[in-house]
Amino acid sequence: MSSVSEVNVDIKDFLMSINLEQYLLHFHESGFTTVKDCAAINDSLLQKIGISPTGHRRRILKQLQIILSKMQDIPIYANVHKTKKNDDPSKDYHVPSSDQNICIELSNSGSVQTSSPPQLETVRKNLEDSDASVERSQYPQSDDKLSPPKRDFPTAEEPHLNLGSLNDSLFGSDNIKIESLITKKTVDHTVEEQQTEKVKLITENLSKLPNADSECLSFVGCSTSGTNSGNGTNGLLEGSPPSPFFKFQGEMIVNDLYVPSSPILAPVRSRSKLVSRPSRSFLLRHRPVPEIPGSTKGVSGSYFRERRNVATSTEKSVAWQNSNEENSSSIFPYGETFLFQRLENSKKRSIKNEFLTQGEALKGEAATATNSFIIKSSIYDNRKEKISEDKVEDIWIPREDKNNFLIDTASESEYSTVEECFQSLRRKNSKASKSRTQKALILDSVNRHSYPLSSTSGNADSSAVSSQAISPYACFYGASAKKVKSGWLDKLSPQGKRMFQKRWVKFDGLSISYYNNEKEMYSKGIIPLSAISTVRVQGDNKFEVVTTQRTFVFRVEKEEERNDWISILLNALKSQSLTSQSQAVVTPEKCGYLELRGYKAKIFTVLSGNSVWLCKNEQDFKSGLGITIIPMNVANVKQVDRTVKQSFEIITPYRSFSFTAETEKEKQDWIEAVQQSIAETLSDYEVAEKIWFNESNRSCADCKAPDPDWASINLCVVICKKCAGQHRSLGPKDSKVRSLKMDASIWSNELIELFIVIGNKRANDFWAGNLQKDEELHMDSPVEKRKNFITQKYKEGKFRKTLLASLTKEELNKALCAAVVKPDVLETMALLFSGADVMCATGDPVHSTPYLLAKKAGQSLQMEFLYHNKFSDFPQHDIHSEGVLSQESSQSTFLCDFLYQAPSAASKLSSEKKLLEETNKKWCVLEGGFLSYYENDKSTTPNGTININEVICLAIHKEDFYLNTGPIFIFEIYLPSERVFLFGAETSQAQRKWTEAIAKHFVPLFAENLTEADYDLIGQLFYKDCHALDQWRKGWFAMDKSSLHFCLQMQEVQGDRMHLRRLQELTISTMVQNGEKLDVLLLVEKGRTLYIHGHTKLDFTVWHTAIEKAAGTDGNALQDQQLSKNDVPIIVNSCIAFVTQYGLGCKYIYQKNGDPLHISELLESFKKDARSFKLRAGKHQLEDVTAVLKSFLSDIDDALLTKELYPYWISALDTQDDKERIKKYGAFIRSLPGVNRATLAAIIEHLYRVQKCSEINHMNAHNLALVFSSCLFQTKGQTSEEVNVIEDLINNYVEIFEVKEDQVKQMDIENSFITKWKDTQVSQAGDLLIEVYVERKEPDCSIIIRISPVMEAEELTNDILAIKNIIPTKGDIWATFEVIENEELERPLHYKENVLEQVLRWSSLAEPGSAYLVVKRFLTADTIKHCSDRSTLGSIKEGILKIKEEPSKILSGNKFQDRYFVLRDGFLFLYKDVKSSKHDKMFSLSSMKFYRGVKKKMKPPTSWGLTAYSEKHHWHLCCDSSRTQTEWMTSIFIAQHEYDIWPPAGKERKRSITKNPKIGGLPLIPIQHEGNATLARKNIESARAELERLRLSEKCDKESVDSSLKERASMVAHCLEHKDDKLRNRPRKHRSFNCLEDTEPEAPLGQPKGHKGLKTLRKTEDRNSKATLDSDHKLPSRVIEELNVVLQRSRTLPKELQDEQILK
């Protein structure tokens, strides 16, 4: 075939020839229609057009390289000579000489084409001319193309391939051996056009051997020979039969070269029916010794083995051999092999099962490149026998690439044939470029060349060649082995101090690599020979290896050793220069910079072919310099769970390489690329290609996916990877899944032939004979559907043919015994999978099983099928009697199978790990209500027996546990004797089968509906309910996900259930019964109460754990949350209730942000157990609770309003009529799921309530909609349409949800009660008396003032200044300061800071009585202004301060230490020193308080300090001067409040809203009625006792005082709401207030006036001692005591005044 015709092949035919026709559309879309168009295609271009699998790209590039190479050179042809056995054993055999050799090749249509190469060297001058002519075929001839003749070849539909009949059909009565040897020569195009030659086929007929089973066909190829006197092309075979085989017809030519030298040999060969040929020893003794070629190089056999292992599609030629003769290589007229194998190795080679077709015979890559459909039905044997290395292969070799072949290993000089030389060339050139080792790609390696003998003397033309005579015993001598050398050398380091370092250096003929020691497998550096410019001597026993990038300097101990190294390297360079070729350019699959553990800088990593190269940088890679190579054939890749998420490891037996990518995507790309390379390295396409010979095997038997590469070897179906995963779930007994590409050892010749004979089409005729069109499985079907389909198809036999259903078991067995002795395997398969017993009795005492019958009959395929189904047990199936069978099976259950069984656990459950370790496989039998387990299936005595009627609980574990043998599916059996039996099945189906059978035995009939549920737990419990709380009864319960099904005795209802996520209460308690403690579980759901307890502690623990888990939160879906009785998640109900109680009067409540840490803690608490978690005022902040509600609504799996309805909600806004729009909203809400509908109603009701109080909280419907629109719709941003929808829902809540009028009125009443405390009377009732000092703490400078719960520091400051009649000047700034710790620490309060909240926090101080407030001038105001002005310019405060921590966490020791501080962006950073780049600590200024000063007990080194307070830690800082202290304090103050440090200029001064801030006016707190004297007296005594305790311990009760202000205010409000109007409006003032109002600040302490007032008060109390007041009219004493603890401090006030304050 001409090269032009090959490259013009249509791309479709080309892709079909390599089994990649699925990419036809990709090529057409990219403009590639013929092979010629693909001349410039490369790997990256293939990726761009959409071919992603690396193996497919390699295959395409490989075949394109082979075809396109013929555009540059004309192919080299070969002469083939064979001998034929004549009827007359004494007849001479001879081979005539041929001036021209004819090569037979495949054309596009599958025909054979001949070409006439130039005349080659004459073999012998005087050879007899043969008068015999080629027997001509009757096929027509067309265009000089030769097609193989037709032959009836068994197709996939035929039941069996009979080797004997096949032999006859191919070659008539004689077995024919055809061997070919193709010798390649370079040919001139002009000579080729001028010469034509007749084709003569020389064959060799062998008579039948005695044992046919030990023989195989070896159809290797056709050899051509002829004379000049032929008739041109008339002798060509004609026609285009479809079969790949053709029957050779022609007369054999005898060559006297092979006439036996002794007449004694003839009879021997006649008896053995062998071709007579000289012995090997004779040939060796008489061979001429030719001249040794000057520059030839040998090829080692190890390389051939490596190529054979790596090749993805093997096409081997197997020579016909005789088992009675030693395995000698064929002797050809143009060459001879002198590398013989040992006799014993030859005898080991078995050719019993080899069945070769033309696909094995024509070994030319041209046959693959063109569209010849080569039927690859040859079966190869994977037994561990050595394959001969004299296999002959054909190749087209371009002239410029003749020498460009890579040799991986060096060997000693050897003899070889010319043909073996070309065999090595073929293997080198035909291998895909990506299959070469990357080392050879990057290195411009020294190539080992094999030259034909005709070219050893130079570049001779064809005429010169033809004039030379070639000896029939010409030998090829391989070149001497490459010099390799290794040893210890000193290498000069390239960087740093440039010191010599000892390295183990190796030179392997291709590159220099150096290691830390001789045991390491991975080098520290590689210097390829191609990168070396020269090697030169340097003084002191040193030599240099010079490359373009750098010069490597090595030093040795002796000069002789240095000279040896230099000599070896220079010789290698010289050899390279003589044979150098252009470097192969291959685009790497993946390259880039990665971090490699152990290296500081990033490493340039390259993945190409089956290796990963590590280089220092990209330039080194381009130059060929590298660090090391990681071969993929021994590697594995996995992700690494470290702090760096982008890490992965390549693991080899010798070392693990840990890489880190920059992004997660890059890491995944690398892992995927490496995994693909590993898979391609280990894959072998040979088995797949042979099995795909049957066209039906090219699509998955289950889902029709193309090119399936997995198979179930016992079911005889070829399946895809997705279906293979589901086949494994059936268990190895029902489906044995194996890979076509990687499980090579399992694929024997018989097994491959079995798959070819049956095929997916014929297999599906049985398995899917009743499959309907709508029940078919598709490629993209989900996993669950795929699993169900495969289970129904193979396990249940739902779709299989039922033609044999009428047969009984005995009849099926008889039919099976009759079928196995015939070649029809399909019949055997149908019988076996229809219920026949594979181990049934045959009636033959010797051949007692069907397998032995098949062996007796010599049916190897039947034997193979029965062998892989020896454990199969497919039940007899009848669709029509299915109901009857199931009914009978329910009444009498019998099961037997191997199960994993663990020893029974007594008194308590063993650990899971221990149970799994003690698990052993047992033969289990369930029969007659007893479960017995045996040591094995042959044992007669059981190891144990379980009475199923005694079972009280059966637990099923849906998760699979893993043993060394694989996953197992566990179920547990509990007995009243506190024994637990654990069993494990290999599949989930087997687990369900056993548990259903066991449950039917111990669950009574009235509760059998429980067994219909998909339960995880089923059994018997004792219960009590509201119908009978006096005694315990027995009931049957089953757990199904989150539902508890139960059937209770004494109830007419057959069954009921509890929704466990709706439980209002789930608690466990202990009671005593009959002297024993009993654990009882209480379940309350919507008014139904159920008490349960178990028979034993073990089974109760199982039930309690399962119920508690099912009742908890399971996922982020709304329906998976713990629900209230109204189907509203408990977390939503709790947040709504808390905000309603404490937040209706809070301004902008839903627009405030909470603390992220507190929010996450609350969410986690609710998720853990929302039912038992309670929100508490004081402990949980309002802002955190509102944020939790918004976060929950935003994070659920689907939006509350559902994303599916989103367009409908938005489109409703187009309706202008309000009533119509409201109707649409109602319709949308009714279409929501039940939980969504109930939750939405609760949310909108709450928002409606909040907006009703918008005058107080400023949260109208629009503001609420702005907040909640993104939460309810779960959109990233806010749109006006979403806001309008939510606003509509809030405003029209009553109409949309059809709320009744009385419910609306009730809501208004509740709102009024909740918000009433915000009125003037309520607000004043919550005021407290506080002593505030002016400028200094002196008795005459104090003022007792009323502090309201909402008073800010600015109000307090202005009120004090007004009382004192102080008018600040223009430059003065007054502020309120907080002074604590005995006046050692003070800080200014921000003008917006709440005063009362700060005062209440004093309770946490060590000495709360020493704290007070003082109003004075802000002396550092000028400094603050100055700092503020400088700060606007972007300055950052920094400096060295001395710090001490309390308690010590960061700092070591208990002394002040120098640290470097930086104040920036609202944070204070602490560094170890000025040079540190990473901070040790970061302080958030917003969460801390900074005081001026340091406590003396800290022993500060200076008197200028600052103290920082957080919730749990204190930090003490010391400055070196007062100015530094002031600068730091002011800078921190400014940073804390973001420059908003005083009220804006020109703004009206803010004053208190009360009538008179000084004592007087309305009551400060509720006054006790005179009639309640007894209670008041008790309160006074209690307060005095508390005061005494305070004075003794100087500590207050932190827990009671730490309550929030709003909780106390709400209590005060509650008291006032129920107070009688008459009493509340009484204008009379308490005498104590009159006393206080008249008291001047200057009055001396201890004045008798106070005593008089106190006496008057006591008289009034005595006078009204009998009067009583309703409890709702008094303030709880607890509140008085708590507030009093804060107010009572060590201050000098009259005792009478203190008593009066206590009373208040």
Curated annotation (Swiss-Prot):
Domain Arf-GAP positions: 676-811
Entries under Pfam families matching the protein: ArfGap, PH, RA, RhoGAP, SAM_1
Domain PH intervals: 482-574, 587-679, 878-1003, 1014-1114, 1434-1537
Tissue and organ distribution: Detected in brain, thymus, lymph node, thyroid, spinal cord, trachea, heart, skeletal muscle, spleen, kidney, liver, placenta, lung and peripheral blood leukocytes.
PTM sites of type Phosphotyrosine: Y77
Function: Phosphatidylinositol 3,4,5-trisphosphate-dependent GTPase-activating protein that modulates actin cytoskeleton remodeling by regulating ARF and RHO family members. Is activated by phosphatidylinositol 3,4,5-trisphosphate (PtdIns(3,4,5)P3) binding. Can be activated by phosphatidylinositol 3,4-bisphosphate (PtdIns(3,4,5)P2) binding, albeit with lower efficiency.
UniProt site (Arginine finger): Q1151
Location relative to the cell: Cytoplasm
GO cellular component term, pick one: cytoplasm
Keyword Zinc-finger: yes
Sequence positions bearing Phosphoserine: S1632
Zinc fingers (C4-type) by residue: 700-723
Keyword vocabulary terms for this entry: Cytoplasm, GTPase activation, Metal-binding, Phosphoprotein, Repeat, Zinc, Zinc-finger
Residue stretches of biased makeup (Basic and acidic residues): 142-160, 1658-1675
GO molecular function: GTPase activator activity; phosphatidylinositol-3,4,5-trisphosphate binding; zinc ion binding
Region of interest called Disordered, as start-end residue ranges on this chain: 126-161, 1636-1675
Domain named Ras-associating: residues: 1326-1420
GO biological processes: regulation of actin cytoskeleton organization; signal transduction
Protein's UniProt name: Arf-GAP with Rho-GAP domain, ANK repeat and PH domain-containing protein 2
PROSITE patterns associated with the record: ARFGAP (PS50115), PH_DOMAIN (PS50003), RA (PS50200), RHOGAP (PS50238), SAM_DOMAIN (PS50105)
Domain SAM: 6-70
Domain Rho-GAP span(s) in chain numbering: 1116-1297
